[in-house]
């Protein structure tokens, strides 16, 4: 049962808790940032393109904090577009108003307006990132968010000699908002990107390339690469010629050491990997190519180019202009390499591993579906049918007049319905549109089987959960069956906030709903979000002030 905000006792308890929380925040260090979002002209691929960027930077400014810090980011929207910012992977405990997905937790920041996001970084360490969460703006509005151990603490691995953020992106030579608008209007998929980028630049294999990101390293040192896939729609293979990696964290969750020469990142993923500079002195390409989980079907529309950066050994014997060594990349359709990476990750060994909850309160199976719906009146260039996507047959639609979180807090009827189905619909059931959420009792344990279709071509969907990390208990190919339960890893499963559900396969996740609010659960291929591949969990309040949805901040944007 949701405890109404109008309860005078709960208001008093919340007031007392807020005073304690304010004192706690005051005692913590506060990292203050100002993001000015404006148009800027950038030259790439022999063209000049106007993009939306933060503080004139691509990637945008890096946020660096220690675990336990408070963060305040004033976002000034000087762009012509509505805008929100999402702090991807931040748990937002009791700060759901700062999560950022447009029309889920807030109305957008309108042009010539501002909003200050305030949240704490508690119980998290590693590499996360921030990005726009409205339209395709996140193609250029993104940046790294680094959380280091609090003072006096250390990494659970040998301290690196050097840390290097590597933010991977996709580049279009057209206005990305127009690209999305054209796709939605026509009911078709958006065109593929024109290039990939490493820290905002393409590298020297593209036409008119005049800038390449270079990492200068010393021999026989350990470099911590903080790799982020900020791309919109493409899974990526990542390699450095002549070097191997030891993965130590994903999605700001520590892992058991995992050695590989190929990192695989779905959109939204982060990987912390140690690289030892034990190769011969020289220069080596860092290469990025697409993993196209649809290949070789004719549905594939993936950028087939290669972005590069350079790892340069800074010695007297190394020539700066020497041609770097190129790594041998996997084939774009190499699902075996992708699955080996995703399936091979484990959580840290005991006793460091967090305990997996064993009593499950809510069991769900969510089928990820692609299909078609009739064109609607807003799709001016659509003919007959429009591409669509759904979870359990429901193609998700955002509200237009009020955010879901405001509707939950104010108990406003008519904004959403709490009838999202717990299981796939019978075969042949038509896809429907709706703003359906799944209510969860506070502190309930939820297990979800995510199933990709196996009867026709599908693709690897990176599914992102806001507000929580989850345990990945099992993954496999084909259809999930009850017999797969015996294979659950309840000892050292990896924790993530974004999971790549394999093509023609399944994955099982489990989490505890201990964070009241409205939490988006959606595909992180941005092309699939307006198509409807998402839903929302509405987590009820608990019974104590530290489990109760706080009121909205005074400067929360209005619709």
Curated annotation (Swiss-Prot):
Annotated glycosylation sites: 32, 47, 82, 112, 120, 151, 210, 220, 257, 278, 314, 363, 443, 484, 541
Swiss-Prot/TrEMBL GO biological process terms: lignin catabolic process
CC cofactor note: Binds 4 Cu cations per monomer.
Top-level lineage group: Eukaryota
Residue numbers binding Cu cation 4: 461, 523, 528
Keyword terms, alphabetized: Apoplast, Copper, Glycoprotein, Lignin degradation, Metal-binding, Oxidoreductase, Repeat, Secreted, Signal
Disulfide bonds: none
Binding site for Cu cation 3: 133, 466, 522
Cofactors demanded by this protein: Cu cation
Keyword Oxidoreductase: yes
Pfam families: Cu-oxidase, Cu-oxidase_2, Cu-oxidase_3
Region forming the signal peptide: 1-28
Entry EC no(s): 1.10.3.2
Reaction equations catalysed: 4 hydroquinone + O2 = 4 benzosemiquinone + 2 H2O
Acetylation as UniProt keyword: no
Gene3D superfamilies tied to this protein: Cupredoxins - blue copper proteins (2.60.40.420)
Any one GO molecular function term: hydroquinone:oxygen oxidoreductase activity
PROSITE patterns, per database record: MULTICOPPER_OXIDASE1 (PS00079), MULTICOPPER_OXIDASE2 (PS00080)
Record-listed Cu cation 1 binding positions: 86, 464
Binding annotation for Cu cation 2: 88, 131, 524
Enzyme class, first EC level, given as a word: oxidoreductase
Gene Ontology CC: apoplast
Positions of the Plastocyanin-like domain: 36-152, 163-316, 396-543
Family (UniProt): Belongs to the multicopper oxidase family.
Role, per record: Lignin degradation and detoxification of lignin-derived products.
Record-given protein name: Laccase-7
Lineage of the organism: Eukaryota, Viridiplantae, Streptophyta, Embryophyta, Tracheophyta
